[in-house]
Amino acid sequence: MYKKDVIDHFGTQRAVAKALGISDAAVSQWKEVIPEKDAYRLEIVTAGALKYQENAYRQAA
């Protein structure tokens, strides 16, 4: 899941942080691909509007 898509969905970084119960600073430290645990939680919080994409977190062997 990409940080840009998440922020586009929620409108602001602060709204993302509030939805996850984390700090704005934590969200600001995300890279382009957000942490896997947060992606999974966001799929649940958004009732599937944002999708956890397992392949984004698997490295090629």
Swiss-Prot record:
Recorded GO MF terms: DNA binding
Ranges that cross the membrane: none
SUPFAM superfamilies: lambda repressor-like DNA-binding domains
Record-linked InterPro entries: Lambda_DNA-bd_dom_sf
Start-end of DNA-binding region: 13-32
Gene3D superfamilies from the UniProt entry: lambda repressor-like DNA-binding domains
Disulfide bonds: none
Keywords: DNA-binding, Early protein, Repressor, Transcription, Transcription regulation
Pfam families per record: P22_Cro
Function: Cro represses genes normally expressed in early phage development and is necessary for the late stage of lytic growth. It does this by binding to the OL and OR operators regions normally used by the repressor protein for lysogenic maintenance.
Protein name, as recorded: Regulatory protein cro
Lineage of the organism: Viruses, Duplodnaviria, Heunggongvirae, Uroviricota, Caudoviricetes
